[in-house]
Amino acid sequence: MASRKEALARRASRVRRQIKAVANGRPRLSVHRSSKNIYAQIIDDVAGKTLASASTLEADLRSSLKTGADVAAAAVVGKLVAERGVKAGVKDVVFDRGAFIYHGRIKAVAEAAREGGLNF
């Protein structure tokens, strides 16, 4: 029986393998969720660089949000990363949910990023 950490790593690698197959050179919008915060970044895997990022740890977001661990905070992060991505010249991305299911905070980031101008 695999430990929880091994199972998460295996699930994340399976998702990333599927993303790599359909990416066609597009950068990926990678989302990570912890119990207290949420992080999102647009990564260009070809160049190995992060093009834009946002998280609930940023000073301006921490002061305006009640907590970094709810759906409202995730939506703000999604909107912010989309805004920064469009400013960096990124329109089309592939969504990398990692080992997390597409529900709740992960879904809120994705929907807010779509509203912010990213296509996936």
Swiss-Prot record:
InterPro entries, alphabetized: Ribosomal_uL18_bac-type, Ribosomal_uL18_bac/euk
UniProt subunit comment: Part of the 50S ribosomal subunit; part of the 5S rRNA/L5/L18/L25 subcomplex. Contacts the 5S and 23S rRNAs.
UniProt function note: This is one of the proteins that bind and probably mediate the attachment of the 5S RNA into the large ribosomal subunit, where it forms part of the central protuberance.
Origin: domain of life: Bacteria
A single GO cellular-component term on record: cytosolic large ribosomal subunit
Protein's recorded name: Large ribosomal subunit protein uL18
Keyword Ribosomal protein applies: yes
Keywords: Ribonucleoprotein, Ribosomal protein, RNA-binding, rRNA-binding
Single GO MF descriptor: structural constituent of ribosome
GO BP terms in the entry: translation
A matching Pfam family: Ribosomal_L18p
Homology family: Belongs to the universal ribosomal protein uL18 family.
Organism: Agrobacterium fabrum (strain C58 / ATCC 33970) (Agrobacterium tumefaciens (strain C58))
